[in-house]
Amino acid sequence: MKKTTVINSEISSVIAGMGHMDWLGIGDAGMPVPLGTKKIDLALTKNLPSFIDVLKNVLTELEVQKIYLADEIKTKNPEQLQAIKQLMPNVEIEFVPHSELKKDLAKTHAFIRTGEMTAFSNIILESGVVF
């Protein structure tokens, strides 16, 4: 049995297959996922699992060098922005319009849908290297 913290087989497989500068998306229950993008749906009910819990779990296995967030998170969900910054204090953040973030999901290896029900709780993680 796997010893590390990501025990979801689909998430683990996606992370294992990622290389430097590849993208992985995580988001709220309402984020539209482009056709052709792999969707890993973890949503069970409202706010379960939460966006931040899923992000914490993924960060135990994925080296992240940069993140992409919607500009709108600054004013519409500053609490979530603070939580993200606390998890990754030294990671570069690029803010883009929410409409662009939605389109960029087509470039991700997968999108992990959570049960999160707060606006703009969406992120694209850009993988780094561990050496």
Swiss-Prot record:
The keyword Iron-sulfur does not apply. Belongs to the RbsD / FucU family. RbsD subfamily. Pathway: Carbohydrate metabolism; D-ribose degradation; D-ribose 5-phosphate from beta-D-ribopyranose: step 1/2. The lineage of its organism: Bacteria, Bacillati, Bacillota, Bacilli, Lactobacillales. It catalyses: beta-D-ribopyranose = beta-D-ribofuranose. This is D-ribose pyranase. GO terms for molecular function: D-ribose pyranase activity; intramolecular lyase activity; monosaccharide binding. InterPro entries: D-ribose_pyranase, RbsD-like_sf, RbsD_FucU. Pfam families: RbsD_FucU (PF05025). The active site is at H20. Substrate binds at D28, H98, F120, S121, N122. Keywords: Carbohydrate metabolism, Cytoplasm, Isomerase. The gene is rbsD. Its EC number is 5.4.99.62. Homodecamer. It comes from Oenococcus oeni (strain ATCC BAA-331 / PSU-1). Catalyzes the interconversion of beta-pyran and beta-furan forms of D-ribose.
